[in-house]
Amino acid sequence: MPAALQDHFFQRDAQVLARDLLGKVIRHKVGELWLAARIIETEAYYCAEKGSHASLGYTEKRKALFLEGGHIYMYYARGGDSLNFSAEGPGNAVLIKSAFPWTDATSDENALAQMQLNNPDASGAIRPPQRLCAGQTLLCKALGLKVPAWDAKRFDPQRLLVEDVGQTPERIIQTTRLGIPSGRDEHLMYRFVDAGYARFCTRNPLRRGQVEGRDYLFLDQGN
């Protein structure tokens, strides 16, 4: 049985949590298989800034954002499911932006094959592993995570958990979040990417034309 992170792990500042989730593995049990993906990209959100759902106020749909750290907040984005974890402070959370398929003794090649069946490309063909979870809705589809099943719930170590498997990014890229409308605090550098997996995330922050110090920063471990 995988060893789940405890709820208190999530009861931290959203930016701290967003960085510390990089390298952790999400596992979702579907049938007899533990589908798994290593988190490579996260975004922090605060109630006090305009880019967050919580800044629009409390509603029943958004209640998970206002619960203590370690609650699951899921919503629909562009027709797909998105996964967030509440952090310390009402309205603060971390969006799991992208991940990379993870295989080990618990989550084997059969689990990866099931993830590929869950998330074919637009033509119905099998996606290569490196593109399988390269976006917030893609990772939920690959892992079989659905809004009705998990929104406002706690983790269940028998079915859904986050595990520390000993993988720590050597460097983290800090940059601006994606898809934030103009005038909604789009300038805030609340997006964090495992530098070793930058080319597999939603949008590579190291792509041509991006300038270090202007568009992104490198954070070494301990920063």
Curated annotation (Swiss-Prot):
It comes from the Bacteria. One of its GO terms (biological process) is base-excision repair. Its EC number is 3.2.2.-. GO terms for molecular function: alkylbase DNA N-glycosylase activity; DNA binding. Keywords: DNA damage, DNA repair, Hydrolase. Gene3D superfamilies: Methylpurine-DNA glycosylase (MPG) (3.10.300.10). It is an enzyme of class 3 (hydrolase). The keyword Transmembrane does not apply. It holds the Pfam family Pur_DNA_glyco. Belongs to the DNA glycosylase MPG family. This is Putative 3-methyladenine DNA glycosylase. It comes from Pseudomonas syringae pv. tomato (strain ATCC BAA-871 / DC3000).
